[in-house]
Amino acid sequence: MFQKFYPDVYMDSTYEIDFEQLYQDGYRGIIFDIDNTLVTHGAPADTRAIALFAELKRIGFQCCLLSNNKEPRVKMFNDSVHVNYIYDAHKPSVQNYKKAMELMGTDKNSTVFIGDQIFTD
């Protein structure tokens, strides 16, 4: 019953993920948490995050930030990476995961979620 709460893969850092392989495997959308997933809590997008999103766009991914934070925090990060975003997402409720996939034009079979928390992401 609780298996759906656990990730398929654990990584030490978002920046270790082989996104080219994910694309080759048929994934087309990536939903990201922000804090402690892409940057430290409350930090703006750094050069590493900006480069990552540029690379993801080059590969062909659609991306969406999904955060329980308020809009000013999410917008501050997104101003540097320019992707879809949803703030005040009420994770782990599935409603805004579905909305993110709608924004990206993907579905649950072609979308990956990347976050740092088991029960809130």
What are these regions (language model features)?
Residues Y6-Y10, V39-A43, C63-C64, Y87-K91:
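Short, flexible loop segments at the rims of nucleotide/cofactor-binding pockets, characterized by
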Residues S80-H82:
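Short, structured coil segments at secondary-structure junctions
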